[in-house]
C-alpha cells in the first residue's frame, strides 16, 4: 500500500494551468546578507544554462534575467512544477553600494553576486583641528 498526500486545491491549480496554459510568475529564490564591506546575494537557478543569464544595472536597479528552456512537447508530463521560459527579478540597490564593482559568479545552479559598499559610505574617522589661541594681555 502506498500512502499519498493530496492537496485538491493544488491539483485544481495545476489542472487549470495545464488546460488554460496559464502560469504563475516564475520564482527566483534568493538569500542576501552583509559580509563586512560588501553585500552578497545568491539566487537559486537550477537547470539554467550560464549562457542564458543576463545582469544589468540602471539607476541603482539590478535586474537578473534567466531562461530555463521548455521541455520537449512530445513528453506526456506526470508532474511539471519547475518554472520554464524567461523570468527575471529586480533588486533596488541603495546609493551606498558601488554598482560599478559588482562581481557575479555562477556555479552549481547558484548565481552569486558580490556588491561592495561604496568608499564614500564606509565609516571613517574625521580629524578634529584645534587652534591654540593666545590670550591678549589687556
Swiss-Prot record:
<dbReference type="Pfam" id="PF00011">
    <property type="entry name" value="HSP20"/>
</dbReference>
<dbReference type="InterPro" id="IPR002068">
    <property type="entry name" value="A-crystallin/Hsp20_dom"/>
</dbReference>
<dbReference type="InterPro" id="IPR031107">
    <property type="entry name" value="Small_HSP"/>
</dbReference>
<dbReference type="InterPro" id="IPR008978">
    <property type="entry name" value="HSP20-like_chaperone"/>
</dbReference>
<comment type="function">
    <text>Not known. This protein is one of the major immune reactive proteins in mycobacteria.</text>
</comment>
<comment type="similarity">
    <text>Belongs to the small heat shock protein (HSP20) family.</text>
</comment>
<feature type="domain" description="sHSP">
    <location>
        <begin position="21"/>
        <end position="131"/>
    </location>
</feature>
<protein>
    <recommendedName>
        <fullName>18 kDa antigen 2</fullName>
    </recommendedName>
</protein>
